[in-house]
Amino acid sequence: MALPQGLLTFRDVAIEFSQEEWKCLDPAQRTLYRDVMLENYRNLVSLDISSKCMMKEFSSTAQGNREVIHTGTLQRHESHHTGDFRFQEIDKDIHNLEFQWQEDERNSHEAPMTEIKKLTGSADRYDQRHAGNKPIKDQLGSSFHSHLPELHMFQTQGKIGNQVEKSINDASSISTSQRISCRPKTHISNNYGNNFRNSSLLTQKQEVHMREKSFQCNESGKAFNYSSLLRKHQIIHLGEKQYKCDVCGKVFNRKRNLVCHRRCHTGEKPYRCNECGKTFSQTYSLTCHRRLHTGEKPYKCEECDKAFSFKSNLKRHRRIHAGEKPYKCNECGKTFSQTSSLTCHRRLHTGEKPFKCNECGKTFSRKSSLTCHHRLHTGEKPYKCNECGKTFSQELTLKCHRRLHTGEKPYKCNECGKVFNKKANLARHHRLHSGEKPYKCTECVKTFSRNSALVIHKAIHIGEKRYKCNECGKTFSRISALVIHTAIHTGEKPYKCNECGKGFNRKTHLACHHRLHTGEKPYKCNECGKVFNRKTHLAHHHRLHTGDKPYKCNECGKVFNQKAHLARHHRLHTGEKPYKCNECGKVFNQKANLARHHRLHTGEKPYKFNECGKAFN
């Protein structure tokens, strides 16, 4: 005796997800799920259209006789026997339902389907079905063909169910070779237990477990599993952008892109982070943001195993390994691996500084520079050293500071092998070898290898001395000079020589003094070969060869090759005698004269004549 048989319905190949499973799907997977379900529904419908005589025997448990029922009405009939009401809204009247696919999900855990409109169907169709054992009228005529709805998803009773949306007018145009349904990859809902075992037509359709990529683009040759994906792809070649923004006129090839774009004008940010409350205009942006809280970094570099939380960051990182720099500056030809770096670089040519500080009005070419600058006003120092507890306003400064603890010096000079803990220090050092002086004074055309040296030099022209000593009122053009000067009043000498215990108020003075003990003279004159233990001494000596006397007296016009000589000479005009003897109160205009005078009080006579042994002070 043959087993009871039932018609194949969409429920036989339906795929259902629970709410928890749905949350785990990303937007691309959800879109793919929808496309698969739509295609399966089309294929089942096409079987009825291409073979209108395809019927199946259904054994009625209530009447004991056989009824001939079409696929389109079986599911509606069975829902009343099984008591399954999840699909009754679909079954009332397939012509009187209208749904609209929402292009963008309301949030990350809601199902992407909202019922927009539902037209009331006839309530007495149930009675018409069960009035007797008459076969149900064929509902698959031309009217059904012109209004055949597509499948969509909606959330109900903890399941992602299936609903119907719009008409398929081209279902009959799908060839038999294209009507191969995709085998479900998750739990298949089959509440009726009726397998279409004896149907050779269905067996033929289900032989292929995975759909072949039978839909090929004529332009690019790319193949797709589903005709809907092919249609979306072909829009790229056609340049078709049918969705236009009413505000700015920008056009898009997908409605969901237009919906997301409109939020730029409205400022709408419907997606909110539960951790920090930050809102976003796109669900993808919220998903990426959540990784900052979870620490998730799903994108990993195959070369160095470095992981990233954003796919775009991994793409940029890969260019480091490949050495790829696709973005080129049209002005100087310099290339960059990131378009943002090129944008910032272009501002060097244009002089554009679009980022302005609201506190002091200072402008910057980079937003990150403005952010760092703003911390000067707020005093914020969010970056803390775990070793010593020192805080910094910039992450890069903290990174450089950590190298003081570790002793790391990753930047090495290829010329002399000297190593540095900062990249900027290596760049400055390179200029010693190349002789490059990129910083030029606009007043006197003098050039410098360091920007700080240029800033100091400019103060000479404008006569600006912004830094004033609170003790004596003396002003300085550099804050470092003021700090050094302040030590004269305090008597502080924090730098101590380990050899003789002598103290100094400047670190450079200690370094120079240390060479007296070691005998080191690293500075050599290229003209005569004479060596010096101080760079300033070499510079003074070099002027003897060149005859250069850059220091001029404004009173008498006399010139000098050393700044100290000019200062000493200037006191002849002013009558200033800043050096005073603590013993007798006598004053002198030169420090050397005070030292000579001081020997009269001490009786010291350091200079001895070798012939007779007589000593002099």
Swiss-Prot record:
KRAB domain segment(s): 8-81
Keyword Heme assigned: no
Gene3D superfamilies per record: 6.10.140.140, Classic Zinc Finger
GO CC list: nucleus
ZnF bounds (C2H2-type): 215-237, 243-265, 271-293, 299-321, 327-349, 355-377, 383-405, 411-433, 439-461, 467-489, 495-517, 523-545, 551-573, 579-601
Any one GO molecular function term: DNA-binding transcription factor activity, RNA polymerase II-specific
Gene Ontology process terms (BP): regulation of transcription by RNA polymerase II
Cellular localization per UniProt: Nucleus
Keyword set, alphabetical order: DNA-binding, Metal-binding, Nucleus, Repeat, Transcription, Transcription regulation, Zinc, Zinc-finger
Main location: nucleus
Function: May be involved in transcriptional regulation.
Family: Belongs to the krueppel C2H2-type zinc-finger protein family.
Protein name, as recorded: Zinc finger protein 813
Organism: Homo sapiens (Human)
Lineage of the organism: Eukaryota, Metazoa, Chordata, Craniata, Vertebrata
Gene behind the chain: ZNF813
